């Protein structure tokens, strides 16, 4: 049974040459970095101010300037923090792949990378899920709880938030693939060298 599972592992990602595997993983990390960084920047700069009529006294409208900012919603703040941390994680892993090949302590490097990748997937998943829930609430409201929708008044704010969500979901999918590849890399045992060197 164990032999069959090892054979299955050797068919996909592991059947690639080690150098090709390294570059595939590196390119996925670069794409994930750009996706999560874009989500962080777009949501972090998301703000819209509008002047709306809030009441009418006689025939005179009373206007007020209202602002929609990502800081007003804790779920969006968590989204920015989660994607920012994922961007930093990916940047550190890219630097480690390029320059840190000799930084391995008793073979723990691959295990730590796999654990950190899984933690990052969980963090981004939580952030994007919370933000998606609040975005849906802002778009459609909730008539049972008497929460009004705001996207009919702050269209640009909602459009930018939607773009940030798309980028973050793309980053999450890439991070899931990276996490699977890290675990496979951890499980694959290097094949023993069959050449014998005689001194």
UniProtKB/Swiss-Prot annotation:
It holds the Pfam family CASP_dom. Its main location: membrane. The chain crosses the membrane at residues 23-43, 75-95, 113-133, 164-184. Keywords: Cell membrane, Membrane, Transmembrane, Transmembrane helix. It is a multi-pass membrane protein. Residues 1-22, 96-112, 185-199 are cytoplasmic. Residues 44-74, 134-163 are extracellular. It comes from the Eukaryota. The keyword Transmembrane applies. It is found in: Cell membrane. GO terms for cellular component: plasma membrane. NCBIfam families: A_tha_TIGR01569 (TIGR01569). Belongs to the Casparian strip membrane proteins (CASP) family. Homodimer and heterodimers. This is CASP-like protein 1B2.
């Amino acid at each position: 049974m164990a032999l069959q599972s090892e054979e299955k592992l050797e068919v996909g990602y592991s059947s690639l040459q080690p150098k090709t595997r390294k570059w595939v993983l590196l390119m996925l990390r670069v794409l994930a970095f750009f996706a999560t960084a874009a989500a962080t920047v777009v949501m972090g700069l998301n703000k819209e101010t509008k002047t709306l009529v809030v009441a009418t006294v006689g025939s005179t409208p009373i206007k007020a300037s209202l602002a929609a900012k990502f800081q007003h919603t804790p779920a969006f703040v968590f989204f920015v923090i989660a994607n920012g941390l994922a961007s930093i994680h990916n940047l550190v892993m890219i630097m480690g792949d390029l320059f840190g090949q000799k930084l391995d302590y008793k073979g723990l490097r691959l295990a730590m990378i796999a654990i950190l990748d899984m933690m990052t997937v969980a963090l981004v998943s939580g952030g994007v899920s919370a933000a998606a829930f609040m975005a849906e609430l802002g778009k459609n409201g909730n008539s049972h709880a008497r929460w009004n929708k705001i996207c009919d008044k702050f269209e640009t704010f909602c459009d930018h938030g939607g773009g940030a969500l798309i980028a973050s979901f793309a980053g999450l999918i890439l991070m899931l693939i990276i996490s699977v590849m890290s675990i496979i890399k951890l499980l694959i045992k290097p094949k023993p060298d069959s050449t014998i060197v005689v001194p």
